């Protein structure tokens, strides 16, 4: 495996909402339907949104594209495996660009503290 891209993003949690009241308009733009369901049920929705936002920003930075030019927030979904670790799942133009570049694996690390959420994404080729 070789590293094809590395991206990191940090988000100031308070920019996405106050207390337990998140910016729902932003959440609907950023989150996939499955993530939206989790967001609505989450005890700390602002933190949930901040971590998903950071992970998706880190992913597009790793790919070197940013959001736009055919790539949507909806093309990146953060899921948790059976051990609770986050995993990235790609669709649409993001998945097509990964395939075209020979990217076969992604690794994501997400963390949050009192004021910030941070994520790092590594994209790998065979």
From Swiss-Prot:
Cellular component GO terms, alphabetical: cytoplasm
InterPro entries, alphabetized? 4-PPantetheinyl_Trfase_dom (IPR008278), 4-PPantetheinyl_Trfase_dom_sf (IPR037143), ACPS (IPR002582), Ppantetheine-prot_Trfase_dom (IPR004568)
Example of a GO biological process term? fatty acid biosynthetic process
Reactions this protein catalyses: apo-[ACP] + CoA = holo-[ACP] + adenosine 3',5'-bisphosphate + H(+)
Q: Kindly report the protein's main subcellular placement as a broad class.
A: cytoplasm
Keyword terms, alphabetized = Cytoplasm, Fatty acid biosynthesis, Fatty acid metabolism, Lipid biosynthesis, Lipid metabolism, Magnesium, Metal-binding, Transferase
Top enzyme category: transferase
- State the HAMAP family in the record: AcpS
Instruction: Please give the family membership noted in the entry.
Output: Belongs to the P-Pant transferase superfamily. AcpS family.
Please explain the role this protein plays, according to its UniProt record: Transfers the 4'-phosphopantetheine moiety from coenzyme A to a Ser of acyl-carrier-protein.
Q: Which NCBIfam families match?
A: acpS, pantethn_trn
Protein name as annotated: Holo-[acyl-carrier-protein] synthase
């Amino acid at each position: 495996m070789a590293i094809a891209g590395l991206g990191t993003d940090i988000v100031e949690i308070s920019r996405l909402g106050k207390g337990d009241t998140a910016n729902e308009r932003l959440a609907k733009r950023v989150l996939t339907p499955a993530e939206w369901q989790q967001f609505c049920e989450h005890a700390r929705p602002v933190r949930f949104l901040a971590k998903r936002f950071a992970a998706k920003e880190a992913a597009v930075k790793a790919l070197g594209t940013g959001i736009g030019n055919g790539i949507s927030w909806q093309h990146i979904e953060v899921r948790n495996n059976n051990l609770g670790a986050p995993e990235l799942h790609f669709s649409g133009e993001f998945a097509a660009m990964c395939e075209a570049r020979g990217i076969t694996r992604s690794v994501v690390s997400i963390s949050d503290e009192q004021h910030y959420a941070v994520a790092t994404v590594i994209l790998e080729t065979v």
